[in-house]
Structures are given as structure tokens and as C-alpha cells.
Amino acid sequence: MVDRVAALCNYNVLEVVFSYLDLNDLGRCSQVCKSWFHFLNDENSDVWRFHCLNKLPKEVTKSELLSPVPTYKTKLRAFFHSWNPSDCSRNVYIKPNGFTLHRNPVAQSTDAARAKIGFRHGRHAWEVIWEGPLGTVAVIGISTKEAALQCHGYVALLGSDDQSWGWNLVENHLLHNGDMQGGYPLLNNAPKYQVGERIRVILDCDDNTLSFEKNYEFLGVAFRGLPDKKLFPTVSAVYGNTEVSMVYCGTPLDG
């Protein structure tokens, strides 16, 4: 009985202490001992709940948007990987939920946005949801920090140079270095994207490939031979008042 009370007290003390630490310190704490590791390994613990609700609006934590990330810890991680309000076109702003960009209705402009965190190692997956009209061009993919985020006219900005790779959802074309790299997916009469569908983007920095999934169906490798550079989730849009959400999911599950 005494041991159980002591264990409960220890749990409560850790919960309070860890709630006041920043996230970098929590990472270090998980490496101190097995007990702390197991404590922090509970992704729905009150510690992760506290930090999650401290960063994210409560309504978004319960929304369908974050359904791919069911735990408090994964929701928090997704927030830190979401759109970067300091790395987007001047005609784009990030909504208060942190996960959705809004393109202002500016004529003769194509506008893009990048995520806060890029990748150079490992395998990563994120979901993109176009929540408004696509317009004449709507591109999802990746870019380096050197890729442009705004240009004149209505064009496929993402994929227009050697620093970006994209899939134009309107025409089902792959784009890189200003050239069309072929149709995608490689299906006869491939269905067009429908507003609200979730596209899962899979970046494999070990194999240097970029792939896509839709409705849990793997669509095949879109790009190979990606450079050994930090690559960021990116989209470019042309339609006024359209909105695009992005949710980082972590390491993709095989099969």
C-alpha cells in the first residue's frame, strides 16, 4: 500500500514538473531513466494534454482536420510542422488554427507557402486538404528554401524551377524545373481531385523519392533522385479566398 501511494505521489509530482518544462527539456528528460521515458511515452498523458492545449486552440484539437494525429503529442508535433507564417507569399495568411492557409483574392498572382520544418533525413508523411476551389492551377509538393513563393500571373509556381517539385491537381501533371514530367497518377482516365479530399504526401529522404496517396491508395512514386537538401512541404495556389490545410503525420506506415 505504501509503495502504491509513493508511486502515485511520484506520478503526480512528475506531472506537475513536466508541465512547466519546455518541449526541448521534455525530450532530454525522456533520456534520463526508464521511468521517465515510460511516463513521457504516454502520448495522451496530462503532460502532453497541457502542452497541446497551451499551444493549439481547443476547438482544433477536437476537429476532423486533426483526425490523422489522434494523440495530444502527435497533434502538438503536427502544429510545430504546420505552415510557416514567415515563409509564405505576402498574399497568403495563416488562419488562427495554425494549420490552414488562406489566399487573398489578388488578381494576376500565384502564391505559395512552405511549412515550418524541412527534412533531409528519414521518411515523412503529411496530409494536404484543399478546402476551396482549385482554380486553373493548384500544386502540392516540396521545395527548398530557395524556391520562389510569389510570381505574376496564374502559373504552376511550385515546380517552375530546379528548387521545387509539384503535382498539379487540376491537370494531373508532375512539374519540375519548369517542365511537365508526365501525367500522374499513371492510370487511364485518372480521376481528378475533388475539393476536400485528403492527399497524403510521402517524402523518403533515404531513397530520395516523393510519392502520393489518395483515399488510402498508393499512387506510385512521383519523383526520384531528389537532392541532398532540406526539403519543405509546399503548395502554390491561384484562386482567391481558397484555403489549404496541412497536417504532419510523422513516419509513414508501410503497407
From Swiss-Prot:
SUPFAM superfamilies: Concanavalin A-like lectins/glucanases (SSF49899), F-box domain (SSF81383). It comes from the Eukaryota. Pfam families: F-box-like, SPRY. InterPro entries: B30.2/SPRY, B30.2/SPRY_sf, ConA-like_dom_sf, F-box-like_dom_sf, F-box_dom, FBXO45-Fsn/SPSB_families, SPRY_dom, SPRY_FBXO45. Its main location: other. Pathway: Protein modification; protein ubiquitination. It is found in: Synapse. Keywords: Neurogenesis, Synapse, Ubl conjugation pathway. Signal peptide: none annotated. Residues 61-253 form the B30.2/SPRY domain. One of its GO terms (biological process) is synapse assembly involved in innervation. Residues 3-51 form the F-box domain. One of its GO terms (cellular component) is nucleus. PROSITE patterns: B302_SPRY. Required in the presynaptic motoneuron to down-regulate the levels of wnd and restrain synaptic terminal growth at the neuromuscular junction (NMJ). Belongs to the FBXO45/Fsn family. Component of an E3 ubiquitin ligase complex composed of hiw and Fsn. This is F-box/SPRY domain-containing protein 1. It comes from Drosophila persimilis (Fruit fly). The gene is Fsn.
